[in-house]
Amino acid sequence: MRNVELETVLNNQLNIGAFQDYAPNGLQVEGRRDIQRVVTGVTASQALLDAAVAHQADAILVHHGYFWKNEPVVVRGMKRNRLKTLLTHDINLYGYHLPLDAHPELGNNAQLAKLLEIQVLGEIESLLPYGEFTTPLNAVALRERLEKQLGRSVLHCGDRAPAEVRRIAWCTGGGQGYIQQAAEFGVDAFITGEVSEQTIHIAREMKVNFYAAGHHATERYGIKALGEWLAEQYQLDVTFIDIPNPA
């Protein structure tokens, strides 16, 4: 497949025109024209780039790419090294941020719901879905399910919250700012990747279970699902490479 064809396929599948994002979605760094071997990962870190070079990839597809708003525009240091790796090895870099969070089947939020066996009911607002467990789950058991499925420890604040969780909202990655909207909507619990100092106070005062399960850990599954879809639909050789990150 040509690199520009792959961009069109991904742009259409993820409906990128519906989003105002913090970084460009699509082909961010152009490499060789023809693509057969693709590496997917959460973030276009140097470690992922090096793994893609070792894998002889034609393209890298990530959730966290480059050229974020307000980042320095000069090419030096870390940015130079990353771009040099891509350009020296003629590797294409594709990045999809909010469109990959939001996709109703392949997105990070959809995939986390699938992993946790949550029945999705709708959205409180854009990027903030809610749903229910068929059978209410003890709040501690939910933390244990998260830890088992994600393979990491999970912070749980349930000081004044319901002991059982039926209705739940979630936002993968750095979605802790949505906790108040979720609590006001009337959920028993809210899951995201990160925690801020004020998040715990809000959880306590609004009597909602809060879980911080890791930015990286909660966002592994969208990019993995997108790569699997590409492999199935277009017969590309796609490999997901997980670069461990405790954050």
UniProtKB/Swiss-Prot annotation:
Source lineage: Bacteria, Pseudomonadati, Pseudomonadota, Gammaproteobacteria, Enterobacterales
Positions contributing to a divalent metal cation 2 binding: 64, 215, 219
Quaternary structure note: Homohexamer.
Domain of life: Bacteria
Binding site residues for a divalent metal cation 1: 63, 101, 219
A Gene Ontology term for the protein's cellular component: cytoplasm
Family classification: Belongs to the GTP cyclohydrolase I type 2/NIF3 family.
Cross-referenced Gene3D superfamilies: NIF3 (NGG1p interacting factor 3)-like
Keyword DNA damage: no
Keywords: Metal-binding
Stored PANTHER family: GTP CYCLOHYDROLASE 1 TYPE 2 HOMOLOG (PTHR13799:SF14), NGG1 INTERACTING FACTOR 3 (PTHR13799)
Organism expressing this protein natively: Yersinia pestis
Gene Ontology molecular function: metal ion binding
Record-given protein name: GTP cyclohydrolase 1 type 2 homolog
Database matches in SUPFAM superfamilies: NIF3 (NGG1p interacting factor 3)-like (SSF102705)
InterPro entries: DUF34/NIF3, DUF34/NIF3_sf
